[in-house]
């Protein structure tokens, strides 16, 4: 029995057709990402109304939790290009085993992740978290640890479903999870519906519960959807295979580290910015939130590019892969540039939505220009990095991410903010954004160069 082919794999495609396929895949991913962001915002609002210590605990704890999860989830993203290549090559019998090995890897990665969440003492000491906040943070992280296996298993399903070009299920599951988490977290934190008020730990418990709900929905979808039957996903279950696991790790560890490098660089920038005072760090946070929100669009399109490039590479159709990169790059940069122009024109009312404090708004308005430029070049490097993942090239991109985000954005930003000529006595958070712009410009050049090299390889230029 042949697998259902979701996209044409051999017919010539126009740029409009490719753009349509990218939009078809990207918009459900974008909605799913925005729903996930709304859960983090909800946790902040819910605990903020409960108490300052609990809000601080969730702020610190969620930063630790997200860093650990993104590192491990990044490794599991290796399932996406692996399955996309199998799908493009119509290796139906290899698709089910690839998912099974991904699930095994998720369970293995859960062990060190649980240990870090259950015993975060050294991480909190490094951050110099006050004792009263640290206690609540430990409780929050311990609660989230119970849901870590579920979130890793679900993210394996997430990568698998993306690779097959079926992102709408991810959007629906994200809607279910978000609509469950918000009232559940409120009830657990504040003690509604007869439950005792738990404070910060309530958000952690709710996060763990909805992670298991997400995985249950994903597993149920795989088990009962007819389109997946040819892949025999749960039949002939295979034990962990050393060769397959090593292949996933070889591909996934650089992906996980790349994600961790980006996340940690912005986390550390926020910590360094805190030295500049409440107004500076609050203004930085406003602009960082805007940047994160805008980033969801190029990230969603880039995920679609990864999948379509991976499918084309697996099908040995390099012309289609190159066309996907070309159209995807133009589409993404064009949209982000438009958003940047609109943000610049409407910067004052947009910033006013985030803060009523004139001092905070003044800092944020002084930084808006930087993110308008930053987002354009960040979109270029994001598309290029994901296209390279579609070609199963991940190690060199990891090194480039380290150079640009740790070496320039973080280290260079620290120097520009605190030690650049004229700023020793009047440090400014703008230094970090100046360095970030330089870092993304360099990243866009280096990633663009590497992508061109990869696309010109003999196996990627045949027609």
UniProtKB/Swiss-Prot annotation:
Location relative to the cell: Cell inner membrane
Signal sequence interval, chain numbering: none
Stretches assigned to coiled coil: none
InterPro entries per UniProt: MATE_fam, MATE_MdtK, MdtK-like
Keyword Chaperone attributed: no
GO BP, sorted A to Z: monoatomic ion transport
UniProt KW keywords: Antiport, Cell inner membrane, Cell membrane, Ion transport, Membrane, Transmembrane, Transmembrane helix, Transport
Family: Belongs to the multi antimicrobial extrusion (MATE) (TC 2.A.66.1) family.
Functional description taken from the UniProt entry: Multidrug efflux pump.
Name assigned to this protein: Probable multidrug resistance protein NorM
Organism: Aromatoleum aromaticum (strain DSM 19018 / LMG 30748 / EbN1)
